[in-house]
Swiss-Prot record:
Keywords: Apoptosis, Host cytoplasm, Host-virus interaction, Inhibition of host innate immune response by virus, Inhibition of host RIG-I by virus, Inhibition of host RLR pathway by virus, Interferon antiviral system evasion, Viral immunoevasion. Plays a major role in antagonizing the type I IFN-mediated antiviral response. May also inhibit viral transcription and RNA replication. This is Non-structural protein 2. GO terms for biological process: symbiont-mediated suppression of host cytoplasmic pattern recognition receptor signaling pathway via inhibition of RIG-I activity. It is found in: Host cytoplasm.
Amino acid sequence: MSTAMNKFTQTISKPATILNISDSEESGDEAGVGKVSRTTQSSERWLDLLIEKFQPSLQNITRYINWNFIRICNDRLKKEKMGYIEAKQYVEDMAWMVIASEADSIEWKCIRRQEKVTGVKYPKFFFVQHKEDWIECTGCIPYPGHDLIYDEDDDD
């Protein structure tokens, strides 16, 4: 167990590598360590696009994710026995929330259909700025160049 934890700690301690940790428990030498899944690559690319769009306000977002991931591991992995995949998801959710707060002057876009196509899941219940009103839209994150989309046939 300590060997696996040491490998995991080394992996997450490298700058800008948090989103490179695989979501698959079957890949890598130890579960979730080593290989990059297709979903994770997509998630990493979305983060890159958002950072480019919202520069310079988000220039430290990767550093924030790394720092928070280590903090969450320390606080939750040991005390609450949260698995590293759950801890990773929690920190990614936190990062999207930071993006939301940093970019609140930007018009928010829904990428619900993109989420369905890629299989990449994003945090739910973001507040979306649209036509000068704040409205709640399940599954929304900012996505430059896309219109706000509501799928009327969605149950969730």
